[in-house]
Amino acid sequence: NELYELCAENEIGMVLINSNEAKRTGDDSLEKMKEKANAEGYKMPYLMDEGHLVADAFGARTTPHVFMFDKNAMLAYRGSIDDNSEDKNQVTKHYLKDAINAMSKDETIDPNITRSIGCSIKRVAQ
């Protein structure tokens, strides 16, 4: 929610998209998504990517995998939220936060690409 608030302050939209198609009957079911959104106090839309079409179109490989676009709908940042997906207390680099701050000041985002870290997106055969 801290990142959502930072985006809102800078008139940047945010949406979460769940693309784990192969786990729809378990932890990534619509009901579990609603429970997580409520428990975490999400204020942004949390959407289900049916058939992982959005993930495939963007080339997303992991959860999370960030894609941030500028006001001209150009990809401005792609990659990880930060440098530690397992322990938020061990984070030393805040990639997305830095990218949001740079974008809000019309500064160059550096780095504008980082390696996405997290669990792989669970796709189904089509």
Language-model region placement:
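Structural microenvironment flanking redox-active thiols in thiol-disulfide oxidoreductases
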Residues: 1-38, 50-55
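Short secondary-structure transition/capping segments
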Residues: 9, 27-29, 57-61, 76, ...
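Extracytoplasmic/periplasmic, Sec-exported soluble proteins
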Residues: 25, 58, 88-92
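Short, internal strand/loop/helix patches
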Residues: 33-70, 75-76
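Thiol-/selenol-based redox modules, centered on thioredoxin-like
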Residues: 68-126
